[in-house]
Each structure stands twice: as structure tokens, then as C-alpha cells.
Amino acid sequence: MTNITTENCAALLDILREKNPLVHCITNYVTANTVANGLLAAGASPVMADSPLDAEDITAKASAVLFNMGTLSKDRLRAMLISAQKAADMAKPIVLDPVGAGSTDNRLRSTMQLLRQFRFAAVRGNASEISALLMTSPITMKAEKGVDSAETTLEDKISLAKKAAKRYSCTVMVTGST
């Protein structure tokens, strides 16, 4: 495993900016502007497109795909399924942000459908969201109400990340409270 250093990060950022990858984002309207600006600042070119009619074509042109489960709708889920299939067919990485995964049955069911059907390069979420994906509820955690995270220790987050990474065969990042 390579140690993460400032120099390594700077070199990777230079490569990212040189390649200027197109990233197909199917995200929620709450964060679309922030996500687009973050990708632009990093050197990528985001395309914010959540229509099932565009999903296959845009994913075919993209270098990577990002799914955000916030403000989930039937059409947005359909677009994700179409996009994920195209990304899988073309071996393109997909990142999943399971926003509020444990807050409703629909979000959890939809997120689990994606995780069962497709391989993700990475999943990022707060402790409550990752716990929901593992169908666990550590004693230190409260029930998830929305996109807020339960109080957890660093050790809890590390344990959740390791368990989820093993289960879903991908990189898992457990973020702090939102």
C-alpha cells in the first residue's frame, strides 16, 4: 500500500487535470451545483444529467459515473440502472453516495438493488448510511432520520468501512457528521 503524501496527492491532481475526464453525475438537485463545482475545481468535466433518455449515451462518453441517492425518483433510479449497465459493459468506474439510505424503505431498497446488480469502484457515506447498507445498527448509533449521521467513534467508522468494503468489494469512505 502506498503512503498518502502531499506530493502523491499533488501528482494525482496534476494527472486528473491533464486528463480532464468527463464525469456523468446523476445527483440530487440539492447538491448538483456543489458537486459540479467540486469536479471542475479538481480538473474534471461534470455533466449533470438524470434523464433515462440520456443515461446510456452520456455514460458511453464519460470516463466515470457518480450516483447520489438524494431526492430519489422513479426516473432518476431508472437513469441510474441504465447508466450502471452501460458503465459495467464498458468497465467504467461508478461511485455511489447513498444519501439517507436508512431514512426510507424506498431509498434502502433502491440502493441495495444497485449494489446487488453492479460493482462500484467506491461508496461514500456517513456512518448511518454505511450502517444501513450493512443492515446493522451499532449500539452507539441512533436511528437515521434523514441525511444526518449518528454519533460514532473513529473506531466505529473504521470498522464500518472495512465491513462494507469487504461485502461490496470496493473502496468505502465513511465521512463525518453532516
Residue ranges of predicted features:
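Conserved phosphate/ATP/ADP-binding segment of small-molecule kinases
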Residues: 106-178
